[in-house]
Amino acid sequence: IFRSAAALNMDAVLLTSACSDPLYRRAIRVSMGTVFQVPWTYIENKNVSWPQGGMDLLHEYGFKTVAMALRNDSVRIDDEKLHEEEKLAIILGTEGDGLAAETMADCDYTVKIPMSHGVDSLNVAAASAVAFW
């Protein structure tokens, strides 16, 4: 995810406590060192919890939030209204369980990547690269 964020000019990566440590030796190696190129921070602290506090903070700072999720009400990632938004925060879940229902409910948009018949999902690294593009 960090390598894609660096390659595709993302402004920053926000992490929760559930994320892997980006400074772990293997994470640095897998990211090809891009963890040192992209600004990042944890969105949680003693005053802000995830998901509710973090989502509130993003909205307070003027971000529209985008949940990457396969749902019937999801808009396509190439939907024009997404391109019109000035500040987007892309919310990614785990590969197995995805995002919690409460997190998706707090997002301004739920977005899907159109895929060929018979393929229903991408891993989170591939999906993030498509979303960042």
Question: What are these model-predicted stretches?
Answer:
Residues I1-D73:
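RNA substrate-binding interface of SAM-dependent RNA methyltransferases
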Residues V66-V119:
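Active-site/ligand-binding-proximal alpha/beta "capping" segment
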Residues H59-G62, E86, A126:
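Generic low-complexity, intrinsically disordered sequence content enriched
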Residues S4-L8, C19-F36, A101-W133:
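Structured adenosyl-cofactor binding patch, chiefly the S-adenosyl-L-methionine
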